[in-house]
């Protein structure tokens, strides 16, 4: 999968802040498992899941890539298209959190 394919899938999950993000976290965990990356999924607040993945050797140092998957509700916003479907218009991509965390997560996963 390329970055745009991953982003399209991530945006399709309705991870509105007061709802669960479990299915999205499981999707990412399964995606990483294809590359032999071990993950841990654990629940923070009820219905809100965190995913921990570690790549590389057990040595001092390293880097942490951290993000969030929740989005604010779209009610009352003037979306012309479905905010949970990635749309390309004039060489730009539109979708809920396409340029925020879901975009970042797609780049990291690609």
State what each model feature region is.
Residues 1-98:
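Acidic/His- and Gly-rich active-site-bordering loop/insert found
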């Amino acid at each position: 999968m390329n970055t745009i394919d991953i982003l399209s899938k991530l945006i399709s999950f309705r991870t509105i802040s007061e709802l669960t993000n479990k299915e999205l976290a499981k999707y990412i965990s399964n995606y990483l498992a294809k590359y032999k990356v071990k993950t841990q999924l654990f629940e923070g607040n009820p219905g809100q899941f965190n995913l921990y993945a570690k790549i590389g050797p057990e040595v001092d140092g390293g880097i942490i890539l951290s993000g969030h998957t929740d989005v604010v509700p779209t009610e009352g916003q003037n979306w012309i298209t479905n905010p949970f479907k990635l749309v390309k218009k004039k060489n730009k991509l539109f979708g809920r959190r396409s340029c925020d965390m879901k975009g970042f997560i797609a780049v990291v996963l690609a």
